[in-house]
Amino acid sequence: MPGTKRFQHVIETPEPGKWELSGYEAAVPITEKSNPLTQDLDKADAENIVRLLGQCDAEIFQEEGQALSTYQRLYSESILTTMVQVAGKVQEVLKEPDGGLVVLSGGGTSGRMAFLMSVSFNQLMKGLGQKPLYTYLIAGGDRSVVASREGTEDSALHGIEELKKVAAGKKRVIVIGISVGLSAPFVAGQMDCCMNNTAVFLPVLVGFNPVSMARNDPIEDWSSTFRQVAERMQKMQEKQKAFVLNPAIGPEGLSGSSRMKGGSATKILLETLLLAAHKTVDQGIAASQRCLLEILRTFERAHQVTYSQSPKIATLMKSVSTSLEKKGHVYLVGWQTLGIIAIMDGVECIHTFGADFRDVRGFLIGDHSDMFNQKAELTNQGPQFTFSQEDFLTSILPSLTEIDTVVFIFTLDDNLTEVQTIVEQVKEKTNHIQALAHSTVGQTLPIPLKKLFPSIISITWPLLFFEYEGNFIQKFQRELSTKWVLNTVSTGAHVLLGKILQNHMLDLRISNSKLFWRALAMLQRFSGQSKARCIESLLRAIHFPQPLSDDIRAAPISCHVQVAHEKEQVIPIALLSLLFRCSITEAQAHLAAAPSVCEAVRSALAGPGQKRTADPLEILEPDVQ
């Protein structure tokens, strides 16, 4: 409501949503709830998809409601206070860098964000002539940065081993563990390990659920659940021996797709906090809320500037969707760190939409020699690990066809002669090229380069008169803006392809325990049947044609994930089996006869005796997270 906000905002955020009501999908964590804004996402055209996803992104900046303050938000006093405290702890390490280290850690999207931010802040420190103090850990190692290897985040011991390697011999280590849903065992193990040695370690947990919604099922190789670890951290926060930063940002526009808002909010929160620490330590003062708010407003401005390009974003979405529909490919070619954003978007389509790694791929143009921990892990590993300029020119360019779409992502500070050369080479193969070009007021794209593109999403940023660290605000804005555009385009393209039911991705590949629980939640949501029955159907679909034995039923979730990861259409088959009360073989036949997965499920839901729509998820038992 106007007039009730504590702070002045750059953008208009949506009114507090239905998802904030305590009874809405009560048993499901916020990060897995369905967003009421997008309940008809599957019926939207490209323009409306951009509008709806833009509204979901704006919820990141929503303040706590005056009448309805169920959850703490990014601008809540408690969150801002914790951010100031953590920034102060980072400053202590910056002031005495010998033996100091800041570790950013996570699995999947969170690990890729950890990678991107450690690269950025090391770059900032090198530019000041300082020794870089940041490193990153990603479940599964460097290969997980450029390829989809999601199952790796399910081991707490793996997380601890990796942390011990990088922290060996250090005297003061701040470990920022990122888990959007407060669910990744990889991070839980690290946080627990840090709490057992607070003389050296300071654990900081970042996620976007209340601690009461953190995952509470057993971790296979650890004695505590994620929720128990987070509760222990909250107790230690009273003495500033651990910190939990977990504002609510609302459900994802595509249910559970934490690469979107979860990834963006991670970037916004941590870059704000860390940049405030660097800016103020150089001035010899402590970080303040005022400094945090100034930086947060620049990210709000990024939202405004990005979504002012909505018509062109919708056009790009349609072009990408057409290429994918014709079985063509989409290549996202980005310069410098915008190339990292491009790689992330392509990789994340694999597990989000069950896409082939060749469908949407990102490439990084520019030097990346000092970005990775273990560059050797990425050399000669096969086509899905290729991402460099050389890879694009030697293995992609020769095989480009007219049905492929290539998106060039650069700033006007990049080497525009190099951009033009690559664009000209691509244009000989396909006319489906687009540009996402970032400029500062006063810069213009050279005419010869401009003429090569039929359409350009041109984003102009205001001049920022900041000191050195302030230059990074512009870099962070451009990265976030690029992420918003690419996430919206790739998500929307798959919506237009008919892959989404309401705002749920039914046909995802179950590649980790989080996705196993999400699959179970969807079966309960759409079938209205009991948890026990849904588990039975899910296990039958996973292990088919092997009959379900008591041994299989009693097996740990990792065994089911291992089998499910290799299979397609597990969830739709399990759901059709529940809706038609039929065998797995009959469910497969129903699916094969339908034009698409979503059509098969829609017609089953509309059949005699079925519920017409999915009810809000009140049937889930509280222990299913």
From Swiss-Prot:
Protein role: Regulates glucokinase (GCK) by forming an inactive complex with this enzyme. Acts by promoting GCK recruitment to the nucleus, possibly to provide a reserve of GCK that can be quickly released in the cytoplasm after a meal. The affinity of GCKR for GCK is modulated by fructose metabolites: GCKR with bound fructose 6-phosphate has increased affinity for GCK, while GCKR with bound fructose 1-phosphate has strongly decreased affinity for GCK and does not inhibit GCK activity.
Gene Ontology MF term list: fructose-6-phosphate binding; glucose sensor activity; kinase inhibitor activity
Spans annotated as Important for interaction with GCK: 199-200
Disulfide feature: none
Outcome of substituting P446L: Protective factor against diabetes type 2; correlated with high triglyceride levels and low fasting plasma glucose levels; the mutant protein is less efficiently regulated by physiological concentrations of fructose-6 phosphate
Pfam families listed in its UniProt record: GKRP-like_C, GKRP_SIS_2, GKRP_SIS_N
Tissue note: Found in liver and pancreas. Not detected in muscle, brain, heart, thymus, intestine, uterus, adipose tissue, kidney, adrenal, lung or spleen.
Stated family: Belongs to the GCKR family.
Effect of D413A: Impairs inhibition of glucokinase
Species name: Homo sapiens
Residues that hold beta-D-fructose 6-phosphate according to the record: T109, S110, S179, V180, G181, K514
Subcellular location(s) of the protein: Cytoplasm; Nucleus; Mitochondrion
Comment text on domains: Fructose 1-phosphate and fructose 6-phosphate compete for the same binding site.
Keywords assigned: Carbohydrate metabolism, Cytoplasm, Mitochondrion, Nucleus, Repeat
PANTHER family: GLUCOKINASE REGULATORY PROTEIN
Main localization category: cytoplasm
Spans annotated as Essential for interaction with GCK: 463-465
Keyword match Mitochondrion: yes
Tree of life domain: Eukaryota
Binding positions (beta-D-fructose 1-phosphate): T109, S110, E153, S179, V180, G181, E348, K514
InterPro entries per UniProt: GKRP_SIS_2, Glucokinase_regulatory_CS, MURQ/GCKR, SIS_dom, SIS_dom_sf
UniProt record, GO biological process: carbohydrate derivative metabolic process; intracellular glucose homeostasis; negative regulation of glucokinase activity; protein import into nucleus; protein localization to nucleus; response to fructose; response to glucose; triglyceride homeostasis
Subunit organization: Interacts (fructose 6-phosphate bound form) with GCK.
UniProt name for this protein: Glucokinase regulatory protein
Domain called SIS: residue spans: 90-286, 320-499
GO cellular component entries: cytoplasm; cytosol; mitochondrion; nucleoplasm
